[in-house]
């Protein structure tokens, strides 16, 4: 049952019954819950996956195909991020992708604090081969924990990201 509060209305010509009664927000939540989201780029269903499901999807790529397993930690935000990068280096991560460029911990570029930056940690360099299955699963768990649930498999040859989410 839905109740609508009676009150004075604003006279905005773009108002609808949904926006005036503020029921529009509830409909958005309702349709977001019952709907199935699809990626506008690939047309595939967007869903959360377990580590094992991500591993299974990884093995659908061609055998011997090479990937970087990437954990996005800063997504298009302003700042220098010196402390964050130093903390990741202290934890043992040596390779990064900063603003699309792969770099080593020894040659991190100086970031302009007034510009937006994207920083990804390259957690592992892997190839599609069953003998690496346990290592891949551990690396995926590590990547998920660093990035709040989103990881990329970056195809080194095609230079394309394949995005997976555990949320």
Q: What residues fall within each predicted segment?
A:
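Conserved phosphate-binding elements of NTP-dependent enzyme cores
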Residues: 1-167
């Amino acid at each position: 049952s839905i109740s609508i509060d009676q009150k004075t209305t604003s006279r905005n010509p773009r108002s609808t019954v949904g926006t005036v009664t503020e029921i529009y927000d509830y409909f958005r939540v309702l349709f977001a819950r019952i709907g199935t989201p699809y990626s506008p780029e690939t047309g595939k269903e967007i869903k959360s996956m377990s580590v094992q499901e991500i591993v299974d999807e990884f093995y659908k790529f061609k055998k011997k195909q090479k990937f970087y397993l990437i954990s996005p930690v800063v997504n298009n935000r302003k700042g220098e991020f010196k402390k964050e990068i130093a903390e990741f280096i202290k934890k043992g991560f040596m390779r990064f992708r900063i603003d699309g460029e792969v770099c080593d911990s020894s040659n991190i570029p100086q970031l302009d604090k007034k510009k937006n930056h994207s920083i990804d940690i390259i957690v592992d360099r892997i190839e599609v081969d069953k003998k690496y299955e346990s290592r891949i699963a551990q690396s995926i768990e590590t990547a998920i924990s660093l990035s709040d649930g989103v990881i990329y498999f970056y195809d080194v040859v095609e230079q394309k990201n394949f995005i997976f989410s555990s949320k």
